[in-house]
């Protein structure tokens, strides 16, 4: 008899809901365990089979930890602001709030159908004013600390969408959505000073149990480098510019300088003869993204300004060029070019026939740049020194002569925080007619997003909120001064920067969260999600957390102690699942046909959690067959408990494999090696089928081990075993080291290195006794007839090799 997954899964999901089985109490004397999923964006497409992979992994941990006696916090919520809902509203004229709510209801239904043990009383939604009140409150704190400021920055402006796009939303000079052309133009934007935390964001990575690859990505993103800032005067102008270089020792090899096209000096120093060429070049650059501009493989382009810089040491005149491979947002937006010892500068110099001067010996700069170390040459007071000595000596000279200084630079830029969007958190700031600005007072938060039918870009670069006159225009009740609300909204990252804190105290309307509760639960013990958030989300959340730590709001320096990235589930054809390819698998269909337990088991058994693996219907069927095998072992045709499950079997053949299973499954779950844990559960079932009778204690232990992966069938079998309560808080099985040892081992007997027989002997048999047994074996005696034994090599517990001729 097969089990009816539809009946069983509905029965237990109803039970958990009615009994609030997974409600997390705040008051508890148990140790805490906080296990978190990256909360999803509730899209119109609903859940796909990639979501449950990470969710099942955290659920297994949560369920095991409850059984191990921990007070477990395992919550779920919705990262529900963002571009797709707004785009949908633009396309259909529907309200993004209604659309979002409908999607959330669908996601919640789907997630509940998979049997995850979330505490739904703690559900949060970033678009709920009671939630984003605190997102806005954090913004006020950032502003008070001088970490939120407005600045004129070049942004990716998409005229067709009427909005600014983040770098990640621009691909090859076009918008990711719709493929519209994107240009760079300066606009006043809100920025967050994440650079003020660069060193701490870098140093504190050391203490985290994160994959090394993710730490490395964060290190590279922050990109700390030590070097010098050097000032170059412009010949014939009362102007100068600064460059940052990690190799001030090569200053004597500088033969030209390059400014970023957006550099403010370009306008001032370009000569009339060069102006047409410069203007044409600036127009061409506008449509390129930073990524395209810095692509190492692309042709170098540039144009001469007609102006010259004065070399700070020699007084030589160096031509000043502009080129798109220099970015205004990186370093100072200007470089000194040392073509003999830098690949990009070398290519540029070759393309435009600029001089190349060798200052570090060891290469052949006629053919290629030399980037290695070596003795300095053609460098006046640096001649004969190696790289490190020369760097120190040059910095000392620059500082003595007022021409430069030692400097640490970062690749990390301040975070562009404003979006010209409707569907985001309003930024709580008012701009007054006298040019001042103030923040909305704390007691007036949340500043609620107004409902509107007019969700279309304003076209001026402001958000659609600019169209809502009665919301935008305000008057100061004290002075009668007129003002306009900030019309930009926050990016989707804002709500996800701190959501893990709100789960700890989701209904608190007096503060972000109770400090005592934060102390009790932080940091998050395990955080699981996709690697696509390796840099930005995790870096932004760490930044906000550190700000809150400095304000005394959170008690830990870091939010997430252990991080794990699950791999991707690909389509059966090994391609990424996508609607356009028609290879998306909907979990609803699988829950209907095979059951949630089968889906959970299959996704955990596919392979290592971090690997990307193709979906296989055959594999799914195999998972279902295993569960049916388990069911038949426990339950008779007429639905009773198998009578061969007894308190004291006559012959206890399962003892060793049971203790091995408890040990391996427990260790593998802890280490997130779910596929090998499930293999061991299969080994146990195979052995149990061979046994005449099965000890009830072992069978109960097995059900406990299976239940975190397959909770519905776990509960049902637990009930069949005679229990009336849920299995969720039953104590986790333990094993006895002494019972893991094999009593009997199989020994291989070889003659001249070839296997001739096998023997089962007691595991603790001595070397001498083993040799005796081997020589007395009937098969071996036959093989040795007429031969002389020259030597016997014995390895206890493994083999006996007899050398004879």
From Swiss-Prot:
A single MF term (Gene Ontology): ATP binding
Places the protein is found: Cytoplasm
Sequence motif: 'KMSKS' region, positions: 576-580
Entry EC no(s): 6.1.1.4
GO cellular component annotations of the record: cytosol
Assigned keywords, A-Z: Aminoacyl-tRNA synthetase, ATP-binding, Cytoplasm, Ligase, Nucleotide-binding, Protein biosynthesis
Domain of life: Bacteria
Keyword Protein biosynthesis: yes
Alphabetized InterPro entries for the sequence: aa-tRNA-synth_I_CS, aa-tRNA-synth_Ia, Leu-tRNA-ligase, Leu_tRNA-synth_edit, M/V/L/I-tRNA-synth_anticd-bd, Methionyl/Leucyl_tRNA_Synth, Rossmann-like_a/b/a_fold, tRNAsynth_Ia_anticodon-bd
Catalytic activity: tRNA(Leu) + L-leucine + ATP = L-leucyl-tRNA(Leu) + AMP + diphosphate
Positions bound to ATP: 579
Principal EC category: ligase
Membrane-crossing residue ranges in chain numbering: none
Coarse class of the protein's main subcellular location: cytoplasm
Motif interval(s): 'HIGH' region: 40-51
GO biological process entries: leucyl-tRNA aminoacylation
Pfam families per record: Anticodon_1 (PF08264), tRNA-synt_1 (PF00133), tRNA-synt_1_2 (PF13603), tRNA-synt_1g (PF09334)
Keyword S-adenosyl-L-methionine: no
PANTHER family with a match to the protein in the record: LEUCINE--TRNA LIGASE, MITOCHONDRIAL, LEUCYL-TRNA SYNTHETASE
Family assignment from sequence similarity: Belongs to the class-I aminoacyl-tRNA synthetase family.
NCBIfam families from the UniProt entry: leuS_bact (TIGR00396)
Protein name: Leucine--tRNA ligase
Organism of this sequence: Geobacillus thermodenitrificans (strain NG80-2)
Lineage of the organism: Bacteria, Bacillati, Bacillota, Bacilli, Bacillales
The gene coding this protein: leuS
């Amino acid at each position: 008899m097969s089990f009816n997954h539809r009946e069983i899964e509905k029965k237990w999901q109803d039970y958990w809901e009615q009994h609030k089985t997974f409600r997390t109490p705040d008051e508890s004397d148990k140790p805490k365990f906080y296990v978190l999923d990256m909360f999803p964006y509730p899209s119109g497409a609903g859940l796909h089979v990639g979501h449950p992979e990470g969710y099942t992994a955290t659920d297994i941990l949560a369920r095991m930890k409850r059984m191990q006696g921990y007070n477990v916090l395992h919550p779920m919520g919705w990262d529900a602001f963002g571009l797709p809902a707004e785009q949908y509203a633009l396309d259909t004229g529907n309200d993004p709030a209604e659309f979002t709510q409908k999607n959330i209801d669908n996601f919640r239904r789907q997630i509940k159908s998979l049997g995850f043990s979330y505490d739904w009383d703690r559900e949060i939604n970033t678009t709920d004013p009671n939630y984003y009140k605190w997102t806005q409150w954090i913004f006020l704190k950032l502003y008070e600390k001088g970490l939120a400021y407005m600045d004129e920055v070049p942004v990716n402006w998409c005229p067709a969408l009427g909005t600014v796009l983040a770098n990640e939303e621009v691909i090859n000079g076009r918008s990711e959505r719709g493929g519209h052309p994107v240009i760079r133009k300066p606009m006043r934007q809100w920025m967050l000073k994440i650079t003020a935390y660069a060193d701490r964001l870098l140093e504190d990575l050391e203490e985290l149990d994160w994959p090394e690859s993710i730490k490395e990505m964060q290190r590279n993103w922050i990109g700390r480098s030590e070097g010098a800032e050097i000032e170059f005067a412009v010949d014939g102008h009362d102007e100068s510019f600064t460059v940052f270089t990690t190799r001030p020792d090569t200053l004597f090899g500088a033969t030209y300088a390059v400014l970023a096209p957006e550099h403010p000096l370009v306008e001032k120093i370009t000569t009339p003869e060069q102006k047409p060429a410069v203007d044409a070049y600036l127009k061409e650059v506008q449509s390129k993204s930073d990524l395209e501009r810095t692509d190492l493989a692309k042709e170098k382009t540039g144009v001469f300004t007609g102006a010259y810089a004065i070399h700070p040491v020699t007084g030589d005149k160096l031509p000043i060029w502009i080129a798109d491979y220099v970015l205004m947002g990186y370093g100072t937006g200007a470089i000194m070019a040392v073509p003999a010892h830098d690949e990009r500068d070398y290519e540029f110099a070759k393309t435009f026939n600029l001089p190349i001067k060798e200052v570090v010996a060891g290469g052949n700069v006629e053919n290629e740049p030399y980037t290695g170390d070596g003795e300095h040459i053609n460098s006046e007071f640096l001649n004969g020194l190696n790289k490190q000595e020369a760097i120190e000596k040059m910095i000392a000279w620059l500082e003595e002569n007022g021409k430069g200084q030692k400097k640490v630079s970062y690749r990390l830029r301040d975070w562009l925080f404003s979006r010209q969007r409707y569907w985001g958190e309003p930024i709580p700031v008012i701009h007054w007619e006298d040019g001042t600005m103030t923040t909305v007072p704390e007691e007036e938060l949340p500043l609620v997003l107004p409902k509107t039918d007019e969700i279309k870009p304003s076209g001026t670069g402001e958000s659609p909120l600019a169209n809502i006159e009665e919301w935008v225009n305000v008057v100061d009740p004290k002075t009668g001064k007129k003002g306009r609300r900030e019309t930009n909204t926050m990016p989707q990252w804002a709500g996800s920067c701190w959501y893990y804190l709100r789960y700890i105290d989701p209904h608190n309307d007096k503060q972000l969260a109770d400090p005592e509760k934060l102390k009790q639960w932080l940091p998050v013990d395990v955080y699981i999600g996709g690697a696509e958030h390796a840099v930005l989300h995790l870096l932004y959340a760490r930044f906000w957390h550190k700000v809150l730590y400095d304000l005394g709001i959170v008690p830990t320096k870091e939010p997430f102690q252990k991080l794990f990235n699950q791999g991707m589930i690909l389509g059966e054809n090994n391609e990424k699942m996508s609607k356009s390819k028609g290879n998306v698998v909907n979990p609803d269909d699988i829950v209907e046909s095979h059951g949630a337990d089968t889906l959970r088991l299959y996704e955990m058994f596919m392979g290592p959690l971090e690997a990307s693996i193709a979906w296989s219907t055959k594999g799914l069927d195999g998972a279902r067959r295993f569960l049916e095998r388990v069911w038949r072992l426990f339950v008779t045709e007429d639905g009773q408990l198998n009578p061969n499950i007894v308190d004291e079997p006559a012959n206890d053949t399962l003892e060793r494999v049971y203790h091995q299973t408890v040990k391996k499954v427990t260790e593998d779950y802890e280490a997130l090696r779910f596929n090998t844990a499930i293999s061991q559960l299969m080994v146990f079932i195979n052995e149990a089928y061979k046994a005449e009778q099965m000890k009830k204690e072992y069978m109960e232990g097995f059900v406990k081990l299976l239940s975190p992966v397959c909770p519905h069938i776990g509960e049902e079998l637990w009930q069949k075993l005679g229990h009336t309560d849920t299995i969720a808080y039953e104590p986790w099985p333990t094993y006895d080291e002494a019972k893991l040892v094999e009593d009997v081992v199989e020994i291989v007997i070889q003659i001249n290195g070839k296997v001739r027989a096998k023997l089962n002997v007691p595991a603790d048999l001595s070397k001498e006794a083993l040799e005796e047994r081997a020589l007395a074996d009937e098969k071996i005696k036959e093989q040795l007839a007429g031969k002389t034994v020259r030597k016997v090599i014995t390895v206890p517990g493994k083999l006996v090799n007899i050398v004879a001729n």
